[in-house]
Swiss-Prot record:
It comes from the Eukaryota. This is Polybia-MP-II. Expressed by the venom gland. GO terms for cellular component: extracellular region; membrane; other organism cell membrane.
Amino acid sequence: INWLKLGKMVIDAL
């Protein structure tokens, strides 16, 4: 799992 990309996706979804 790419946590940096996942984190960015979560932030963009907020």
